Amino acid sequence: MKICLLGDTHFGVRNDSKIFHKYMENFYTEVFFPALKERGVDQIIQLGDLFDRRKYINFYTLEQSKRYFFDVIEREGFVMYSLLGNHDIFWREKLDVNSPTLLLEAYKNIHIIQEPVVLDNADVIPWLCKDNEKQIHEFIDKSTRPYCFGHFELKGFEMSKGIENHEGMDPSVLAKYKQVFSGHFHTKSNKGNIMYLGTPY
C-alpha cells in the first residue's frame, strides 16, 4: 500500500473562479494523477477543506470538481480518506452538517472522517471545535500510534508566508507523535515533529 498526502484543495476558491478551476484541472490532470499512477499509489489522505465555501455549494464548482477530481478517483480505483476541515462544516462549533458528507456519499471509495479514527498505524483527526474538543484530547492522550494526520490550528506556525499564528492549540499537545502532518495553513512549514503540507497548487 502506498499513500499520498494531499493538503487543502478548496474547490470553489475565489468565488468559484473559472480561471482557478482550469488551473486546478491542469494540476490534477497533468501532475497529480499521473504521479500517483507512476509511483503505484493506491490511497489518498486529504487533510481537510475539500470545498472552499462553508454555507453553500456552487453547482459549477460541484460539476467541475467531480469531473476532474472525484470521478477520476472513482474511475482509477483510488481510495480516499478526507478528514473534515473548518471550511467543510456549516456550523462553527460542530461537524455534523458538512459539505463532503452531503455531496460525496455516492462515491463508495471516498470516506469522510468526522471523528477521530485509527487508520493503519496513524491517528486521523478532523477539525477541533467546542463540540469535539474533549473527545479529541482524550483520543490523543490514549493514543500509542506514531503518526497523526489532522487539520490543526497550532500556535507558532505560519498561516501564510511571514505571518505567524498566535491562536489555537499549543503544539506540545502533539509532542507524543513521531510525525504529525496537518492541513489548514496554506504555507508549507516544518517545525519539530509537525509538518504543514500547505496547498498543493
Which residues does each predicted region cover?
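A short helix->loop->beta-strand "cap" motif at the edges of active sites that frequently abuts
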Residues: R75-M80, K176-K178
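Structural motif
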Residues: I3-L5, I45, V124, Y147-H151, ...
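Metal-dependent catalytic neighborhoods of phosphoester/phosphodiester hydrolases
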Residues: N15-S17, G48-F69, L84-Y107, E167, ...
